[in-house]
Amino acid sequence: MSFSRTSIYLRLFSFIIPFSSSIFSGTNFPAMDIFTSSAHMSMGGAGYLKPSPLSSGINPSIHGGKVFSASIIKYPADVVSQNIGISYPFKNNTFASFSVNHISYGLFEGYDENLISTGTYNASDTKISATYGRGIFRLPIKLGVKSSLYLSNYGDHSFNTFSFSSGFSFRVDEQKITLGMSIHNLATNFSDLTVDFYPKVVISGSKSLKHLPLNIFLDLTSEDRSDVTVFIGGEFDINKNLQFRLGSSNRKSSQNIKKNTFSSIIGATGFGFGYEEKDILINYSIYMFGTGALSQSLEINIAI
């Protein structure tokens, strides 16, 4: 790629950043942003440009070849996320992926307006997603779209939601840099319940360092142009089989309840390891909240 073409891409990207940050505002439906990938959780939420058929936090134009993935994530308060996904490339520089994510919020005691017990009930969300993407001719640019159907059940209340995400990415091979932009959670609700949804704009970048076996990921997300969340994470190849990941975000301040110095420092931070043997990659991750609570995740990826 010539320097002039690289300059054009970077100028286009710098124009999109200030424009996109002013499009939307609001607070989103929590189930749309919960961790579903162990690798992304280990980087504290960074890695929108890291391929995963499981992750809810990924640019739809990104894919990682033929792979089947499954993960389980244990959150505080007995909240459990179970996820499976598959991605597959096709001819003509196209790919598709499919995933199912189930989140169980546990068992709750129900009460009527007179505070009389009505028994227990389960609360859960199930998301079914399909993604399609392709390259643009011979250019280093990829486009992708993702559609998701949410099936939510909260005792006597249930509702169905359809959401749509799209994104593009391009790679500058000489500098080993990938840049991308995506818009997530364009949603509509198919029920009598009123639920507010607000799209999220994400600006992402990743770089493979030249003299270190390290990939760095930087993501800026916004549902309100005055409130930007910054995620930064890294993936370090210790050797050909072992990986170490670490990441955090400026959510440290919002999660900081000043419980103690240690919790304030490590809040909103994730770390984890990956071990790869032949066609199998196993990831284990921990995410630490500012309250001192922990989430743990185990994930397996199988090349097919």
Placement of each model-derived feature along the sequence:
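Subset of outer-membrane beta-barrel
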Residues: 24-304
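Cleavable N-terminal export/targeting peptides
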Residues: 1-38
